[in-house]
UniProtKB/Swiss-Prot annotation:
This is Potassium voltage-gated channel subfamily A member 2. It comes from the Eukaryota. Keywords: Cell junction, Cell membrane, Cell projection, Endoplasmic reticulum, Glycoprotein, Ion channel, Ion transport, Lipoprotein, Membrane, Palmitate, Phosphoprotein, Potassium, Potassium channel, Potassium transport, Synapse, Synaptosome, Transmembrane, Transmembrane helix, Transport, Voltage-gated channel. Residues 312-325 are annotated as: S4-S5 linker. A motif (Selectivity filter) lies at residues 374-379. Inhibited by 4-aminopyridine (4-AP). Inhibited by dendrotoxin (DTX) and charybdotoxin (CTX), but not by tetraethylammonium (TEA). Inhibited by tityustoxin-K alpha (TsTX-Kalpha), a toxin that is highly specific for KCNA2. Inhibited by maurotoxin. Inhibited by kappaM conotoxins kappaM-RIIIJ and kappaM-RIIIK. One of its GO terms (cellular component) is neuronal cell body membrane. Residues 1-160, 244-254, 311-325, 418-499 are cytoplasmic. The record marks T252 as: Important for normal, slow channel gating. It is found in: Cell membrane; Membrane; Cell projection, Axon; Synapse.
Amino acid sequence: MTVATEDPADEAAALPGHPQDTYDPEADHECCERVVINISGLRFETQLKTLAQFPETLLGDPKKRMRYFDPLRNEYFFDRNRPSFDAILYYYQSGGRLRRPVNVPLDIFSEEIRFYELGEEAMEMFREDEGYIKEEERPLPENEFQRQVWLLFEYPESSGPARIIAIVSVMVILISIVSFCLETLPIFRDENEDMHGSGMTFHTYSNSTAGYQQSTSFTDPFFIVETLCIIWFSFEFLVRFFACPSKAGFFTNIMNIIDIVAIIPYFITLGTELAEKPEDAQQGQQAMSLAILRVIRLVRVFRIFKLSRHSKGLQILGQTLKASMRELGLLIFFLFIGVILFSSAVYFAEADERDSQFPSIPDAFWWAVVSMTTVGYGDMVPTTIGGKIVGSLCAIAGVLTIALPVPVIVSNFNYFYHRETEGEEQAQYLQVTSCPKIPSSPDLKKSRSASTISKSDYMEIQEGVNNSNEDFREENLKTANCTLANTNYVNITKMLTDV
């Protein structure tokens, strides 16, 4: 007698709701398949399902990582930084946590994040953890003509004509500042300088004749130079305004506010002089108007800050001060406490002295500030033993107070300085990571003409090259075809980044 027995697996599969109803052994095997990654000779092993958690990245996308596959060794080879890959692999294993190894510099780890295409979110998380300050986005106008004009006046490094305009602007600023200083020399001042309002017109009033004389000086050389400078500043400002991508954001930019401050005093002074009537002098209003004009003329000195638009050093200094406002606020607060404390102490220490130089606590504020900042003019000095002890403590406290926030400010300056220098180097250098496809000449011309801003164009060019890399990988997987392409790629990227 023959007894037919069912396979236990079949019986289990026949049960309703059993997990094997949807079980796919091939899919499970594929996800659990191990993959070997060789990083400059150091081999790492992980599972495909670990890498598949982030399919948009270089290692998570099978098509992207295929270009680095070595069929002879059955592994993926990357000639990259080995210590950094520990953190890169942990990013996949932990589900998105990115921690920089202590022995890897910031710039190298940032390059590794970009190479493995972990994405902007991972980069922002890394920068936030490292204390980086988020860079402001600087959009470009959508209109082609406005974009070219905006790049011409706003980005001197974008092209040759833009550099020429920047040089002209710097020369005009310097001429304006030199003229502002020279017109105050005694040899250039009129004998009636006290009645000289703006370098354009001056008025004299004679009591003996009870007459009013007005002498215009529109032919004065300083007025002509000032007018020419204002014409250039106004033209530059209006062109920037009409070509800017955002009219509302244009007036919130500190550089544009400086431009307005540099232009307005001229027109206010000119309008005041032209609108002033002779009878105003008899009514005693001339002195007040001249005082206002002197204050307005003083604002012209802020024109020197226009140089910061063309000076990376001044921009770095401004960014450092902006990032260090909290530390500077603490410094001023500590100095305020010290001034109140030591001015009060030196006043009471010198109170019994007959020839005391500290008649009151407010009078001692100046001495406390000078002593705490270690300037020490010597115009006010304590003479008693108690006053000298207070002065010694004041100087020591000032040194300690000023020294405490300085390292933080220096650290911020180093950060902005290195970020600026690294950005310039990055814009001039593209690292060859694989065998790219040479872009066609029309695309190359378009890349050179459509956008000429170094940093943003660099990112667009790099993205285009990466896309061509994927197309080329599908056509050629053999490494023998890479040598010539790499040579041509270096020449092309050098030509693109020389702008």
